[in-house]
């Protein structure tokens, strides 16, 4: 699919689409001659007063095939994804860009064509395109179809490991390699693993995997979440992140925000003031520059 998509949208769907985009974290604006425009880091979706809808950006294909057509337009005219039914392990993570909360890495081993076909039929896609409220039910479906493994590093453990690795990509490589080692059959045979290439060099993850297993093929690619098994892993990782955030909120009686925005920084200042540095360190990733900025403002 090209990096743009044009269709016609019924006025009755305007508010539904806008509401769904807001739930997905899109930034909403109203440029001239439009009903509204939603923007994310990878795609823009513009609805004009005429009813024309224009989607643009590198994330167009995923957005249209996995969200706009099945959930809003309820058509499937452009969905031409050829199903890859080879047995494989998909790995993905959630939380690495969030100041609060854990780093969660998940793996899914789809061991049969039947399991993979079921994932396609469940409309599994990258968790970033799915509202949080839908993540739980999808995760339950995935667990009923495939072998799964999740590693959740709560902030206290994460911060200790980061101090040891001194590099986020090295830490990610370790969690990914551990997941692959746990899920891969012995011997691996024709089963392979697929992951997003999160480091500038493929060697980072490859070396971590080879320390544990020498018999499994590893495929790394940018935007690996387009693969249905990796997308399934992204959903499990997101579910683990969301449930862990809720657990931390309950344990420390605080409200945590996602991301690393100015609002997140302000919330960190409030936690520091109300609960103290010890609690702040137990709910955040201390290598983020936000942490030192918050401590500095607290000492003024």
Swiss-Prot record:
It comes from the Bacteria. Residues 86-300 form the RNase H type-2 domain. GO terms for biological process: DNA replication, removal of RNA primer; mismatch repair. Pfam families: DUF3378, RNase_HII. Belongs to the RNase HII family. RnhC subfamily. This is Ribonuclease HIII. GO terms for cellular component: cytoplasm; ribonuclease H2 complex. CDD domains: RNase_HII_bacteria_HIII_like, RNAse_HIII_N. GO terms for molecular function: magnesium ion binding; RNA binding; RNA-DNA hybrid ribonuclease activity. It comes from Chlamydia trachomatis serovar L2 (strain ATCC VR-902B / DSM 19102 / 434/Bu). It is an enzyme of class 3 (hydrolase). PROSITE patterns: RNASE_H_2.
């Amino acid at each position: 699919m090209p990096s743009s998509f044009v269709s016609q949208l019924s006025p009755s769907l305007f508010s539904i689409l806008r509401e769904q985009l807001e739930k997905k974290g899109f930034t909403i604006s109203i440029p001239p001659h439009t009903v509204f425009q939603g923007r994310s880091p990878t795609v823009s979706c513009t609805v004009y007063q005429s009813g024309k809808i224009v989607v643009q950006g590198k994330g167009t294909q995923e957005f249209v095939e996995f969200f706009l057509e099945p959930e809003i337009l309820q058509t499937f005219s452009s969905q031409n994804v050829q199903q890859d039914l080879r047995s494989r392990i998909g790995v993905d993570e959630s939380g690495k860009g969030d100041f609060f909360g854990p780093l969660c890495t998940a793996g899914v081993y789809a061991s049969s064509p039947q399991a993979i076909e079921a994932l396609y039929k469940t409309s599994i896609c990258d968790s970033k395109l799915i509202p949080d409220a839908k993540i739980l039910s999808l995760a339950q479906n995935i667990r009923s179809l495939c072998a799964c493994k999740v590693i959740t590093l709560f902030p206290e453990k994460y911060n200790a490991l980061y101090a040891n690795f001194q590099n986020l990509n090295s830490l990610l490589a370790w969690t990914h390699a551990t997941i692959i080692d746990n899920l891969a059959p012995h011997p691996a045979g024709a089963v392979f693993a697929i992951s997003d290439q999160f480091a500038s060099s493929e060697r980072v993850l490859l070396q971590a995997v080879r320390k544990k297993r020498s018999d499994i093929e590893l495929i790394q690619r940018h935007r690996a979440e387009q693969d249905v098994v990796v997308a399934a892993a992204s959903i499990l990782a997101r579910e683990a992140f969301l449930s862990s955030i809720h657990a931390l909120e309950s344990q420390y009686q605080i409200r945590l925000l996602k991301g690393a925005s100015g609002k997140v920084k302000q919330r960190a200042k409030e936690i520091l003031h109300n609960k103290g540095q010890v609690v702040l360190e137990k709910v955040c990733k201390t290598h983020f520059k936000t942490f030192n900025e918050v401590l500095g403002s607290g000492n003024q």
